[in-house]
Amino acid sequence: TTDFRPRQFDLIVFDWDGTLYDSTALIVRCIQAACADLGLPVPSRTDSAYVIGLGLHDALAHVAPTLDKARVPELGLRYRHHYFQRQHELSLFEGTLEMLAALRARHHWLAVATGKSRQGLNEALEHVALRGVFDATRTADETASKPHPLMLQELMAEFGVEPERTLMIGDTTHDLQL
């Protein structure tokens, strides 16, 4: 049967990590390993998970508040080392492909707004064969990172969609603050 109900939203924007991509546990372990590599106090799972969705620099500065700000990029390199060694283990949450196909069939614009880097998102999209599924994406190294609303505002402007016709779907308070 065909669904003729009017759409409530034209643009649906997804967070990536922890929303579509089952990556939370790996990100937490990589943050903890990076801190250990530099001899820093290892943040708890809760503290490590809390920063997911922020840009990497902001996230690492938050979990390692005693680290000299000039050394945050070094911590980022250690995080990336651990993450890129294991990212091949990650996958989409069950039902994600079917949900995206159903939304596409209803003619929604689909987008991603993430705290990941452009390289990280592109590699993840390639890994799960979703490279051409989204109409637009924004990453933390291209625009203001969450919780700043700029990436969401840019996506709405790109499609000419008003906020009341836009739905942001995420898994953290950083996503809700957009």
Which residues does each predicted region cover?
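Active-site neighborhood of HAD-like aspartate-dependent phosphohydrolases
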Residues: 2-50, 64-69
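Hydrophobic alpha-helical segments typical of transmembrane helices
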Residues: 8, 30, 44-47, 55, ...
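Structural signature of beta-strand start/N-cap positions in the alpha/beta core
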Residues: 10, 101-102, 109, 135, ...
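Conserved SAM-binding loop
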Residues: 13, 20, 92, 110, ...
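Helix-loop "lid/cap" segments that line or gate small-molecule binding pockets
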Residues: 34-35, 55-69, 124, 155-156
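Metal-dependent phosphoesterase signature
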Residues: 61-98
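Short, acidic loop-to-helix structural element flanking the phosphoryl-transfer center
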Residues: 84-112, 118-122, 149, 153
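Substrate-recognition "cap/lid" segment bordering the active-site pocket of phosphatases
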Residues: 89, 117-169, 173-178
